[in-house]
Amino acid sequence: MTEISILNDVQKIIVLDYGSQYNQLIARRIREFGVFSELKSHKITAQELREINPIGIVLSGGPNSVYADNAFGIDPEIFELGIPILGICYGMQLITHKLGGKVVPAGQAGNREYGQSTLHLRETSKLFSGTPQEQLVLMSHGDAVTEIPEGFHLVGDSNDCPYAAIENTEKNLYGIQFHPEVRHSVYGNDILKNFAISICGARGDWSMDNFIDMEIAKIRETVGDRKVLLGLSGGVDSSVVGVLLQKAIGDQLTCIFVDHGLLRKDEGDQVMGMLGGKFGLNIIRVDASKRFLDLLADVEDPEKKRKIIGNEFVYVFDDEASKLKGVDFLAQGTLYTDIIESGTETAQTIKSHHNVGGLPEDMQFELIEPLNTLFKDEVRALGIALGMPEEIVWRQPFPGPGLAIRVMGPITEEKLETVRESDAILREEIAKAGLDRDVWQYFTVNTGVRSVGVMGDGRTYDYTIAIRAITSIDGMTADFAQLPWDVLKKISTRIVNEVDHVNRIVYDITSKPPATVEWE
């Protein structure tokens, strides 16, 4: 069965991408209700949507103005498909603009709204069923609807937005000016669920088992009888990709585990034991540490580090592939959060990602990225559904560039060793405290900063290690973890006493945004 035929058997809601950094959160929330959802380009045609056969369509938010010359549009025939449509922020303005209403800069109609506002519901609506008449929502718009199209009526407003929710139930068209996909909209999940279940008629029966079936069909259709290389990093993502690919294509998969000298403590042996031994993956272990470290010598800029490592990874694969003969595909554990941070067709780039854009233009492989529509928590759920043990599935995330982006400034063996040893202590103490499932991600960073200290009767001038620990639901936003003081004290004491060339520990208390999870 092909991917298309499997998809035709699965109810789905399509999200059209108009450029918000958080668009995938819409699809993410809908999938939480047991409904398959994914992003498609706003350039999609009505005919293409007919072939996909969704039960609902969401028009996402975005940074543009609908009346601008370069505004992202929509095939007008989509409004005639008879499929329920929900417009969010820019999406609502687009519906209004295209169907005869009026959108103007917010200064001409009221005030711009950025942050939480109170939504006042003026009429009952299926979309808001089970939610209070007044509720906090996240607004983020510079334009406003001042006249709604014929056939629409007002459902809700805010103090500064005369049309915060509108609908045309006859045509199954709904618009909201706020963002239900973010947690700051207190009843946002209820609103999206009402759209998916009550309005679109979703059964809510999609699961990771469905995803596995679809991806296996897609992989088999793409690969055929050809061969695939997978680069194992030791992290959760590449491990899950390896097990999924083996399930799909068996011995057509060869895994290359590159020891680039930037791994965590004992990482290499653990990877070989877990995936090579327990799961029987065909793994070639390559010691390329000198090759990588020579190239990274004296490199300070994090983007250069990422590009060098991304390029060299592929060159190592190319060398190994030439020995294997006939390898056509390179598999990667790219997640959707990686793509968002690296920018999409409509969204801006925050930083290049180690699995996105770090590859040379003359790469000799086609890419396979089975996880690129998933968030981290979904990858863990996928691993469990594939029968993987919890010690692999709940392994701490590890970036492709390894410790290179956890060492600030030029990379040296001494700095790497401080991070390896301090990170091992951190992970051990977090587990002992029973916090390893509560804290989303945690690791240490060599800040590159030296400071004066006293050990015994002597003066020291050694490195400062930063501890980074965060809580999150999907990795798109995060808060610093409020670790117990006694746990932090024990971690700090152990690192300073057990790790050479370290005399100071600091704790990173920055959320995402404004910071990213990794320091580089």
From Swiss-Prot:
Pathway the protein acts in: Purine metabolism; GMP biosynthesis; GMP from XMP (L-Gln route): step 1/1
Instruction: Using the record's annotation, list all stretches that form the GMPS ATP-PPase domain.
Output: 206-395
Give an example GO molecular function: ATP binding
Q: What GO cellular-component annotations does this UniProt entry give?
A: cytosol
Q: Which reaction does it catalyse?
A: XMP + L-glutamine + ATP + H2O = GMP + L-glutamate + AMP + diphosphate + 2 H(+)
Q: Where is the active site?
A: C89, H179, E181
Annotated signal peptide: none
Identify the residues that bind ATP. Answer: S233, G234, G235, V236, D237, S238, S239
- InterPro entries reported in the protein's UniProt record: Class_I_gatase-like (IPR029062), GATASE (IPR017926), GMP_synth_C (IPR001674), GMP_synth_GATase (IPR004739), GMP_synthase (IPR022955), GMPS_ATP_PPase_dom (IPR025777), NAD/GMP_synthase (IPR022310), Rossmann-like_a/b/a_fold (IPR014729)
Q: Name the Pfam families for this protein.
A: GATase, GMP_synt_C, NAD_synthase
Q: Where does the Glutamine amidotransferase type-1 domain start and stop, copy by copy?
A: 12-205
Keywords assigned by UniProt, alphabetized: ATP-binding, Glutamine amidotransferase, GMP biosynthesis, Ligase, Nucleotide-binding, Purine biosynthesis
Question: Which Gene3D superfamilies does the UniProt record give?
Answer: 3.30.300.10, 3.40.50.880, HUPs
E.C. numbers: 6.3.5.2
Highest rank taxon of the organism: Bacteria
Q: How does it assemble?
A: Homodimer.
Protein function: Catalyzes the synthesis of GMP from XMP.
Listed NCBIfam families: guaA_Cterm, guaA_Nterm, PRK00074.1
Q: Which PANTHER family does this UniProt record tie to the protein?
A: GMP SYNTHASE [GLUTAMINE-HYDROLYZING] (PTHR11922:SF2), GMP SYNTHASE-RELATED (PTHR11922)
Q: What is this protein called?
A: GMP synthase [glutamine-hydrolyzing]
